[in-house]
Amino acid sequence: MYLGIDFLITPELKLYLVEVNVGLPGGAHEYHLTHWVHLGKASDIFQRIESTSQKIYGKTFTDYLHSLPFIDSLKPFKIWMDGMGPFPGTFHPGLRLEDKWNQYQLLKAIAPMPETMIFDPEDTGGGNRFVKRKKKVILKRRVGRGGRDLQVITEPSSLWKLNPVSNPSLLQEYVESKINGLSLSVRSVALGGEFMCMYANLSTRPNSNHGILTFISPGNPFGLSEKHFKTELFNQKSWEAEIWFGKNEPEYLRHNLYEEEVARATLIIPEPFLRKIKELSIKIERIYDELDLFRLPKACFEE
């Protein structure tokens, strides 16, 4: 199953899995841009995805993607998640993979993940104990993207001073994933039991989604090749958007689907650590590919 898998990395080189994205998440296009800026030439990522799809699934990648049983429900579901459309008229249990609590339950035994609990606004004791024990946590939606409504909590009292939480949410252990003062995450892409590509996101915001795209190179020590780097801007329709939407992309997503900023620098990561990311990505992809979607626990949006 084609996946976009998000990791955090602490300054001490501890790796945490935080999220898995299904359908056609970003990743290949972003990697391609970082490859272009860093090496001055096009990557072969799209050809590799296509050849892997044909080798493993016997279909072109577009045909493979549209053969997924939940894909027709997932497209309107993503727009519903953004608050820009109705809940899909046709439901498929594969949508339950969008509930981050389900992801946590599914993967916490096989990958290091920040400790997470369901946030219950009526259970003040449980939330207080979690914040006291972890010192710093984040409150985030169980179903959502783009870091919408994400908040950093450092005191139990602040948890209950928040505006009423209208969406089912999680409390999650805060992981300090920063480099040179910038928030850092790594997006890895896997398909058909094979690792495809990875790149880094850098941001001045607490969450690094849709940040500055950065090429990843093996080496030592862990860090950026340039402390103060320039960036290059791109404004072109992504490969994913063309396949997913064709000519009918929603106007509100234009920034996400077209505009990217790429660092003229690389994130240097030791080779054994890169290997760990690749191995975990393949392991997670195999688990997802072999899931019986009809046996997934119900998601929060079904309750």
Regions found by a protein language model. Give the residues of each.
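Conserved metal-phosphate-binding beta-hairpin within the catalytic cores
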Residues: 1-24, 224-303
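Active-site nucleotide/adenylate-binding loops and adjacent lid/helix of ATP-dependent enzymes
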Residues: 89-184
